[in-house]
Swiss-Prot record:
Gene3D superfamilies: 3.30.300.30, N-terminal domain of ligase-like (3.40.50.12780). The keyword Membrane applies. Keywords: Glycoprotein, Membrane, Transmembrane, Transmembrane helix. It is a multi-pass membrane protein. This is Uncharacterized protein C56F8.02. Residues 1-13 have a biased composition (Polar residues). Glycans are attached at N35, N40, N76, N917, N1178, N1321. It holds the Pfam family AMP-binding. Residues 1-26 are annotated as: Disordered. One of its GO terms (cellular component) is membrane. InterPro entries: AMP-bd_C (IPR025110), AMP-bd_C_sf (IPR045851), AMP-dep_synth/lig_dom (IPR000873), ANL_N_sf (IPR042099), Dip2-like_dom (IPR037337), Mug62_dom (IPR056881). The lineage of its organism: Eukaryota, Fungi, Dikarya, Ascomycota, Taphrinomycotina. To S.pombe SpAC22F3.04.
Length: 1517
């Protein structure tokens, strides 16, 4: 547990580098006295050592000569880890600058420091020199100048008791009949009570049973489970554990089973003490929640034990108590559970101090009234030492210390009533009167209820009882447990409640208590009358104590406090009179430190003593403090044994103190020896402030305290029930967040239970008021405000009362788990460090921005690859020179002539059995059959367009070659999907109409699908509506077979088909949005692709090929239709339908037929991975598994695939990604590289500027892991070019990928668009590259890296291609370029309710829009800040609109890819079905609701998504 969050920040004016390494020996350092153990020394020794340490460690005159000091330089520090602090520079801390239009990009990306705009002028030694001799040394502990005696017998000194259990035995004998505890009900009536004799007897009985029957040893832990109303049973068991020598572990929360189990496990407790009623209730709770009883724990009902009866002439068992008394478990501000160990010695130290303070509290004449004047019904039997009245929980913290332990130590009578009793007007004051209370313990929440009830209706208090009038004259101390002193309220309590009700000195009676609830509830400051003030004040000054200065206050300058400086404008009465002045803050003091405590003000970041009048963390050392956390040694060392440092005036170096302190986590200061607390470290907000002075930009941090902000909100904002405020560290900046609880956020319901519309206008008004009031009163630029219903924010238990836990709220806010109904952002004011590009108007590709990059990288080489030409030479199988071949048809005739009986194709069925072998002769005959049939059709002529609609089969290959021979232009397309007819049919009709399709060739399976009733009706109706005449459908598989060969038919290729501009083949590519792209390839290109594929993959005729999925285009097409003919090898065909039924069949075929090179899509591999097949075959033969992709590769996805398949025998070197697109199926590949792909980490911040900069760590939020796409194959050359200026990019920047290759497509089919035509004959601006380049439209870069070519191979340099993504999908904000996929990945990782792949980011009308498919539609407002923060932190942009839609509403392709274009179109046209829309910046301009108002429409329901299993298998993979 570390109570200080790991956030950077500069603490006030003290900016120092923490001490690192060893500290040089120094004469001053040797003067420190070792004080490592607080519990093994006597109180006197501890006090003397503490004083000696203070006097020797801090030179004379250090405090007296101190002046208010301002440090002008500012530097940030952050907490790192739990045990130490260190300085963090660069990316972790500093803010990215605003880059002007003419920003110097060289400075921006210089080394590892990314745009720091915080500079330090002074050297570190000069900073230390400012502190030498000026630091404020710790306040010395005070002595108790008199012996502490028993209030009932002044002859008995309490120091003779060695433990608190011995004191109880003493009370049981000498105050036997006096009442020890009285428990009241909610109406103030006595519920139960117990005398000291019975209390001691029952405790002895519990101890006896534990000793005799439990089997526990000394120091074993025993759990105590009692409810607050069972306080007497709790006290009995607690002291029973003390007497028995075991360690008590109180547990106060029964509703949290996980917390109970954690405590039982941590403490290894085997025994639990409780009551019969409590045990039955606990059993019912477990049964209701279907939980099991904790294991290995025995449960005893102590209310059935009775009392202890000592035999005649027998002596009491000796007390052999261990060091530890009890372990108190509590939660830290961030919700972590930890136990604090309390020893018996610690208890006695604190009891002595508290007894001395109570003994010196002033008593008044009326306090000595004859008890006969009071109703004897209540006063008879009460202790004459004093009566203690409280409603705080007696089982923990200060309630346990004062209400139980100190009651036993001082012999008081404690009267306890439930917290609900304070809500009864007049009851509390009458209880104090009835019992003649000497001391009462309260908290602000209860005391405010009591006091304000009296203010509203005094008669309810004064007339509450007819027996006696209200009189608080006997009250000596009204103790209030609080963290901050409420100056205004303590005036009200003193002057308008205590004084009117008879208290003679109300200001002295009111005693704020500064306690440490996280550390056992120990008191570190409270009002006392012991003396020693002259040692607390500067120069020994002691002001006379009067009733007027019993309440100490100061009026501080608000602006100075923001810089952690204490500038006092007025004190005490003057402060009260001037508190209404603007820009001031009124702060009240607790009092001097606790009598035996050493207290220091320390800079929490540097651990160096602060200067006077500077806010710092309160560190304290005292014998009354706990020894540490239970079973957490590292946290104990960091928190309970912290060491501060002072600056030597000789060496100007930090000298560590040997005295150990407890870090309280409280921020405050000391003035005239009194302790002022501003709040917890976690409750302090900080915000960056920038301004320009004399042309120099300055940056500092203003600090604000949650308590001040909350008070302002509660006073000025209407309809706020409670609130929380904190800051979050996003984008290297602290951003204030406010969470409001408001009754307006309760979801209204009608009488029938139906929910009605929420008044979002009222919620918007409340949040607007909050933003404006904090800006006006505190100059806090709020980042966002969220609203939820009352009692929904996370709370912590303090004194039995639930209070909002700021750090728990922050954690829940960051995780998006709170039930918020509304969120309002004010990013325009709060976010300062949004980066701006070099050219904010024209973007990163402009001449100006490109010129800056060119100047920055002027010493780097240009990015283009080499070119190795590999033209056709000899056919390896036939040893025939094929350099003169111009078409695949010539190679086919070569196979028929030379190897007619060799097998060309074999079909594999679903069981892995071979079908009928197709030899080259039969193949030739089947192609001739289709040629002969088509020649008879008059409308089939060379140059005509035909569509090949086939399932994966050899019929498709026959038809393809028949088209080649006849000079037809084939366009292969898959069959129509009956599940997506609304998408497929329009695309098919578009193809027919715009490209004048003469015929559609199909096989039997495709024909059956077309003739299906649903499909045929849909097709005919759509054709009629679109006025499209359907062409002839020819079923080629049903043509009568004939035995003539192609040669015998005397079929000759038309010469026009050999023209380089003639499209021999047209590939149809559908984007995820189902946008059709047709690319044309001539015969020479097809041969070149085969040649490049053969050379790069080292393919031979000796190994067969396999065609299975995606056979209509790309690599799948070549492996299915062309490579077998080109190599003269056998091609095995596996139907995608059979693969879907048995995914392992693919690898069984590969293993059986020793296939060396094959391909698979990402969908194919993902399908296999999801099916989890067993009995994998041996895959050692597979050397090259090609995975085509047309964009950026997911490094995490590839790693997971690789890990899975390597586990099943596939070589990690076999994974070969292939970069391909519609213009070239084989642009780059990792085939046979002999190296495992290693992600390269790129800096996203540099990437936005167009630069490539490696990132040093994957833990950085801006680190982008990127995999390469391999090397450039033969006969191919790549260049990286600026897409706008057409200048070659240099190494260190990225640009558009241009390619020159014989495998490039010749054109977009029948396109006359000048832009399309320009893409196919691109040249750079200076002509360096020459002509013939094709622009891919993808962004990427080339980089030379060193890799080992396989295991035990030498390291070689490789030029690798990295693909970033399509340039058409990028968008620019402030002149910086962003890839939507990166932002979408960030969003999907940010919250578990965001579906994977369920995010779309795009730019519309200049606004960045985020559309999210959410899981569930409740409390979507809680997710919005998580999304905005994640985008801001990783990408430094702010989304303008966040819209939510139900899961399944995204249009998706048959491959389950989201269709960005359709989502954008539906958003622009208002047809996107959204459940809520949040405007972060700007308004909806009438399209939706007004600015910042969510659009909640519960009537909308998501449509069921189309499962990928329901589509045709060949379209899935």
């Amino acid at each position: 547990m570390n109570q200080f969050p790991n956030q950077p920040g500069n603490f006030g004016q003290n900016y120092y580098k923490p001490v690192q390494g060893s500290i040089p020996a120094n004469s001053e350092a040797t003067n420190f006295q070792q004080n490592n153990s607080r519990e093994n020394k006597s109180e006197c020794e501890l006090r003397q050592n503490s004083i000696a340490a203070s006097m020797s460690a801090y030179p004379n005159g250090m405090y007296a000569g101190a002046e208010n000091h301002n440090v002008e330089n500012h530097e940030n520090y952050t907490m790192v880890g739990h045990d130490h602090m260190e300085e963090v520079y660069g990316d972790d801390l500093v803010n990215e600058p605003r880059i002007a239009y003419s920003s110097d990009i060289v400075a921006t990306f210089d080394g590892k420091d990314f745009g720091s705009n915080l500079h330090v002028d002074d050297t570190l030694d000069q900073q230390w020199a400012h502190f030498a001799g000026k630091q404020q040394h710790p306040l010395e502990p005070r002595e108790i100048p008199f012996p502490v005696t028993d209030p009932l017998n002044s002859k008995i000194e309490m120091k003779q008791f060695t433990n608190i259990a011995a004191v109880l035995r003493y009370r049981g004998v000498h105050s036997a009949k006096k009442t020890a505890f009285i428990i009241l009900d909610n109406k103030g009536k006595e519920f139960t009570s117990i005398t000291w004799e019975k209390l001691a007897s029952r405790a002895e009985k519990v101890a006896q049973v534990i000793r005799d029957k439990s089997g526990l040893f000394r120091s074993d832990r025993v759990v105590l489970m009692y409810r607050d109303c069972e306080a007497i049973d709790f006290v009995v068991s607690l002291f029973g554990c003390f007497i028995a020598g075991v360690v008590a572990v109180p547990i106060n929360r029964f509703d949290d089973y996980n917390e109970l189990s954690s405590i039982l496990t941590t403490t290894s407790a085997r025994l639990a003490l409780t009551t019969d009623a409590n045990l039955k209730a606990f059993q019912r709770d477990l049964n209701a929640k279907k939980l099991h009883w904790p294991k290995n724990v025995e449960w005893w009902k102590t209310n059935e034990f009775g009392g202890f009866h000592l035999k005649k002439k027998a002596e009491m068992p000796p007390l052999q108590v261990p060091d530890l008394a009890y372990i108190e478990f509590s939660r830290s501000p961030i919700g972590e559970l930890h136990g604090v160990v309390i020893s018996h010695r610690t208890i006695l130290h604190q009891m002595n101090c508290l007894a001395a303070i109570h003994a010196t509290a002033p008593a008044y004449e009326s306090d000595k009234l004859d008890y006969l004047s009071i109703d004897r019904e209540y006063t008879e039997g009460l202790s004459k030492s004093g009566l203690f009245l409280t409603y705080l929980d007696l089982r923990q913290a200060i309630g346990l210390i004062l209400g139980v332990l100190h009651t036993v130590f001082s012999g008081y009578t404690t009267v306890w009533c439930p917290q609900n009793a304070v809500f009864v007007p007049g009851l509390w004051a009458n209880l104090a009167t009835r019992y003649r209370a000497s001391f009462m313990l309260t908290d602000y929440a209860g005391l405010k209820t009591i006091a304000y009830n009296y203010q509203n209706d005094p008669k309810a208090t004064l007339g509450f009882s007819k027996k006696h009038s209200v009189d608080l004259s006997s009250l000596r101390m009204c103790m209030v447990d609080c963290l901050n002193v409420d100056c205004e309220f303590q005036e009200i309590v003193s002057d308008r409640w205590l004084k009117p009700l008879g208290n003679q000195n109300p200001r002295a009676t009111f005693v704020p208590l500064l306690c440490l609830p996280e550390h056992g509830g120990m008191v570190i400051s409270m009002k006392d009358w012991i003396g020693g003030e002259e040692f607390m004040s500067p120069k020994g000054f002691k002001s006379p104590r009067t009733p007027e200065n019993e309440i100490s206050e100061v009026l501080l300058e608000k602006e100075a406090l923001k810089l952690n400086e204490v500038v006092v404008l007025a004190e005490d009465d003057k402060a009260r009179r001037q508190s209404k002045h603007p820009n001031t803050i009124r702060v009240g003091a607790f009092w001097y430190p606790f009598v035996d405590a050493t207290l220091a003000i320390v800079d929490p970041e540097t651990q160096v003593l602060c200067l006077p009048n500077i806010v710092g963390e309160i560190w304290v050392d005292s014998p009354s403090l706990s020894g540490g956390f239970f079973a957490l040694p590292k946290q104990t060392e960091a928190i309970f044994h912290a060491r501060t440092s002072f600056i030597s005036s000789d060496t100007f170096q930090p000298i560590p103190s040997n005295q150990e302190f407890l870090r309280t986590g409280l921020l405050g200061f000391i003035r005239k020896g009194k302790v002022y607390v501003l709040g917890l470290y976690e409750d302090r907000l900080q915000q960056k402030v920038e301004w320009v002075d004399n042309g120099k930009q300055d940056t500092i941090f203003f600090h604000h305290y949650t308590s001040h902000l909350v008070n302002t909100i509660m006073r000025k904002v209407s309809k706020v029930f409670d609130c929380s405020a904190f800051d979050i560290f996003v984008n290297s900046e602290h951003l204030p967040v406010v969470l409001l609880e408001s009754p307006a956020a309760n979801i209204p319901t009608e009488a029938n239970g139906n929910q009605v519309v929420i008044n979002y206008g009222l919620l918007d008004l409340i949040t607007t008021e909050c933003v404006e009031c904090l800006l006006e009163d505190h100059q806090v630029r709020v980042y966002c405000v969220l609203i939820c219903a009352p009692f929904t924010l996370p709370r912590v238990t303090k004194n039995g009362r639930q209070e909002i836990g700021n750090m728990m709220c922050r954690r829940a806010f960051e995780h998006g788990t709170l039930p918020f109904l509304y969120v309002k952002f004010a990013v325009e004011r709060a976010v300062l460090n949004l980066p701006v590009g070099e050219d904010a108007i024209d973007g990163i590709w402009s001449s100006y921005a490109s010129g800056i990059r060119q100047n920055l990288l002027s010493d780097q080489e240009l990015q283009y690859s080499g070119f190795i030409d590999r033209s056709l030479r000899y056919d390896a199988k036939t040893s025939v020179d094929i350099s003169s071949c111009h078409t695949m048809l010539q190679l086919l005739q070569l196979r028929v002539a030379k190897n007619a009986e060799d097998i060309a194709y074999i079909t594999i069925d679903g069981r892995g059995r071979e079908g009928k072998n197709i030899t080259w002769r039969k193949f030739d005959q089947r192609v001739a059959t289709i040629i002969r049939y088509l020649q008879k059709k008059k409308y089939i002529k060379p140059g005509r367009v035909v569509v090949l609609m086939y399932t994966h089969s050899e019929d498709f290959v026959y038809a393809l070659y028949a088209c080649f021979y006849l000079g037809l232009i084939p366009i292969p397309v898959p069959p129509l999907d009956h599940m997506r007819l609304s998408e497929d049919v329009p695309a098919f009709l578009f193809l027919i109409k715009h490209y004048y399709v003469s015929a559609v060739l199909v096989n039997s399976e495709a024909d059956t699908a077309l003739r299906a009733k649903t499909t045929s009706q849909h097709l005919k109706q759509s054709a009629m509506a679109a006025k499209v005449v359907l062409p002839s459908f020819i079923v080629t598989s049903k043509i009568s077979k004939q035995t003539k060969s192609i040669k015998e038919l005397n079929v000759k290729l038309d010469p026009i088909c050999l023209d380089p501009a003639f499209p021999a083949l047209v590939w149809a590519f559908w984007s995820p949005d189902h946008r059709l792209t047709l690319t044309a390839y001539n015969h020479q290109t097809l041969l070149s692709i085969c040649q490049i594929h053969k050379e790069t993959c080292q393919m031979t005729h000796k190994r067969p090929l396999l065609g299975h999925v995606r056979s209509m285009s790309g690599i799948g097409f070549f492996h299915t239709c062309l490579m077998g003919v080109f190599l003269g090898t056998t091609t095995y065909l596996l139907s995608p339908v059979d693969f879907a039924n048995n995914p392992l069949l693919l690898f069984q075929i590969i293993s059986k037929y020793k296939i060396k090179d094959t391909y698979a899509t990402f969908q194919t591999l993902n399908y296999i991975q999801n099916q989890q097949p067993t009995k994998w075959p041996n895959l050692s033969c597979l050397e090259n598994l090609m995975i085509p992709h047309d964009g950026r590769i997911s490094a995490f996805y590839i790693a997971s695939l690789q890990k899975y398949f390597v586990k099943h025998g596939l070589s990690p070197y076999a994974f070969s990604t292939v970069y391909s697109n519609c213009l070239n199926p084989f642009i780059s590949t990792r085939s046979y590289m002999g190296a495992i792909p290693t992600p390269q980490l790129l800096d996203l911040r540099a990437l936005r500027h167009g630069l490539i900069q490696p990132c040093e760590s994957a833990d950085k939020p801006y680190a982008l892991p990127l995999l390469d796409s391999g090397m450039v194959p033969v006969s191919t050359q790549l260049a990286i070019v600026n897409p706008d200026t057409r200048e070659l990019c240099r190494v260190g920047e990225y640009g558009e990928i241009w390619m020159r290759s014989s495998a490039n497509a010749i054109s977009f089919f029948q396109s006359t668009d000048p832009v399309d035509m320009m893409r196919f004959n691109a040249t750079n601006s200076d002509g360096f590259l020459g002509n013939g380049y094709v622009r891919t439209g993808d962004l990427g870069f080339l980089q030379i890296t060193s890799h080992s070519m396989g295991p035990n191979a030498p390291v070689v340099d490789m030029q690798l291609l990295y693909v970033l993504g399509p340039i058409g999908e990028t968008f620019e904000v402030n002149g910086l370029s962003h890839f939507p996929s990166d932002i979408e990945d960030t969003i999907e990782r940010s919250h578990p309710r965001i579906a994977r792949g369920g995010t779309a980011v795009f730019q519309s009308a200049g606004r960045v829009v985020v559309v999210i498919e959410a899981l569930g539609q409740d409390f979507l407002a809680a997710i919005v800040p998580v999304v905005i923060n994640s985008i801001l932190d990783e990408h430094q942009i702010i989304a303008d609109v966040v819209a939510f839609t139900s899961r399944g509403n995204f249009p998706r392709s048959r491959l389950r890819e989201k269709q960005r274009g359709k989502i954008l179109a539906s958003w622009v046209t208002g047809r996107l079905r959204t459940t809520q829309v949040f405007y972060i910046r700007g308004s909806g301009e009438g399209e939706f609701q007004s600015s910042y108002v969510p659009d909640y429409n519960p009537s909308l329901r998501s449509t069921p998504s189309v499962s990928s299993r329901s589509t045709l298998p060949q379209r899935v993979f």
